[in-house]
A protein has these predicted regions:
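Amphipathic coiled-coil/heptad-repeat helices and related helical stalk/stem segments
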Residues: 26-27, 52, 72
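Ribosome large-subunit tunnel/peptidyl-transferase-proximal elements
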Residues: 1-38
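A short linear-motif detector with a strong N-terminal bias
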Residues: 3, 21-23, 45-47, 66-71
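Short basic, glycine-rich beta-strand/loop surfaces that mediate nucleic-acid
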Residues: 58-93
Length: 93
């Protein structure tokens, strides 16, 4: 991540919500979904381990998959409807 401006703005809201959308949660599941196709948007948490998020961000850039940073793992986990943090998640079709 280059600057704070790269953090997802949550569409003018202070929260991110994926309810009603098909979501893949977690780095392993996300990598599998990226290989299989059908990923619409990838999100990664700024406070997640760069060893996890770095390769995901690079894959997205190399394969023209939309990518955005989220402020924290807790925010991303809540958006996905889980009670724990998530390093990465994706909206899928």
């Amino acid at each position: 991540m280059d600057t704070q401006n790269d953090i997802l703005a949550y569409n003018g809201k202070n929260s991110l919500d994926f309810s009603g959308r098909r979501v893949v949660v977690g780095a392993k599941q996300l990598k599998k979904a990226l290989r299989n196709g059908g990923v619409l948007q990838v999100y990664a948490a700024c406070n997640a381990d760069p060893a996890i998020t770095g390769p995901i961000e690079a894959y997205c850039k190399d394969h023209s998959v939309a990518f955005a940073w989220v402020k924290s793992m807790a925010d991303l986990g809540r958006a996905c409807g889980i009670e724990v943090g998530a390093a990465a998640a994706a909206l899928v079709d």
